[in-house]
Design a protein with these regions (language model features):
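N-terminal Rossmann-like NAD(P)+-binding domain of SDR-like oxidoreductases, especially those catalyzing
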Residues: 1-161, 205, 211, 217, ...
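Short, solvent-exposed loop/helix junctions and linker helices
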Residues: 7, 93-96, 169, 173, ...
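Conserved alpha-helical elements of sugar-nucleotide-dependent glycosyltransferases
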Residues: 13, 98, 175, 237, ...
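Short beta-loop-alpha junction of Rossmann-like oxidoreductase domains
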Residues: 40, 164-167, 260
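Structural element of the ATP-grasp superfamily
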Residues: 102, 142, 179, 267-268
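Glycine-rich "substrate-gating" loop/helix at the edge of Rossmann-like oxidoreductase active sites
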Residues: 128, 159-173, 193-205, 219
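Hydrophobic alpha-helix immediately C-terminal to the catalytic Tyr-X-X-X-Lys motif of short-chain
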Residues: 137, 141-145, 175, 179, ...
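C-terminal substrate-binding subdomain of Rossmann-fold SDR/epimerase-dehydratase oxidoreductases
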Residues: 184-292
């Protein structure tokens, strides 16, 4: 990889990915486009940042004419199922239009697109929320560009990623981030439903390490493998997550539109992170800092 574009490269996974890309490919030209729509402002030296939307027509033309990207990591999106349910039009518009823009660049440069797909699309027999719908639309656009125009596409499926610099989406944050906030505010952990929903929590360092392996995998380069799953393969219930925090909890009415269980059936690479150990260590450090 010599010329790399990362959309959403200031965010949680994107920021860690850019760190790793810079370390692994110090001579590569790395360009990040991020409109900071979602929390995150991580930047590093030696990387070109455009703090704007990939949908901006002027920026899009500059990216097409000024650079020649061989690789595009398309991570920019409006995430979080619960937020999407509240803001459906914004979610669908942003996730679909940004994907079309990325395909336009890839067509111009013959780029390989690595697309951040949602693991939830595998579990909904019917479309139950705007986020999943937007990702399905985006997938169809990518499929069209792949079949009709020869753009190479690899789908990346992420499973409940957690770790340092995890984005703060307020009430829409991931369960690990949200529970950290509740502990910090000394408020009970809010569990929607009865806490039996399971998620395949995966450490961000494991994810980006395996993303680097993915880019060098000949099966992916030659199109033999189209889908890559970044998940530990060991789902954990929300109740178990709450118990690891060892904090007061309260149960609330369930939220519609969410899968009962997400489970990575075909993990790509190795995964060393254990979410329960991560939480236990975080809580221990939090208590020590609070006491001091």
């Amino acid at each position: 990889m010599n010329n790399i574009l990362v959309t959403g490269g200031c965010g949680f996974i994107g920021g860690h990915l850019v760190d790793q890309l810079k370390a692994n490919y110090p001579q590569a030209k790395i360009v990040v486009v991020d409109d900071l729509r979602t929390p995150g402002n991580h930047t590093i030296k030696g990387v070109k940042y455009y703090l704007s939307s990939i949908q901006d027509r002027v920026l899009l033309e500059e990216l097409k004419t000024k650079y020649s990207f061989d690789t595009i990591f398309h991570l920019a999106n409006t995430p979080r199922v619960r937020r999407a349910i509240e803001f459906p039009a914004e979610t669908i518009d942003n996730n679909v239009t940004s994907t079309t823009a990325v395909c336009d660049i890839a067509l111009e440069h013959s780029s390989h697109i690595y697309f951040a797909q949602s693991s939830s699309v595998q579990y909904d027999e019917t479309v139950s929320n705007p986020y999943t719908l937007s990702k399905l639309f985006a997938d169809e656009i990518l499929r069209l560009y792949e079949i009709e125009y020869g753009v190479q596409v690899t789908n990346m499926f992420f499973y409940s990623v957690y770790g340092p610099r995890e984005a703060d989406y307020g009430p829409y944050s991931t369960v690990v981030r949200r529970f950290k906030q509740r502990v910090d505010m000394n408020e009970p952990l809010e569990i929607f439903g009865i806490g039996t929903k399971e998620r395949d929590f995966t450490n961000v360092f494991d994810v980006v390490t395996n993303m680097m392996l993915m880019t060098e995998d000949p099966r992916i380069k030659n199109g033999e493998m189209k889908d890559v799953h970044f998940g530990r393969g060991k789902p954990v219930s929300i109740n178990d997550i709450a118990d690891a925090f060892n904090h007061n909890k309260v149960y609330k009415f369930d939220m519609p539109g969410e899968a009962q269980k997400t489970h990575c059936q075909e993990p790509y690479g190795e995964y060393l992170g254990d979410v329960l150990k991560y939480i236990t260590e975080w809580k221990k450090l939090y208590v020590q800092q609070s006491d001091s």
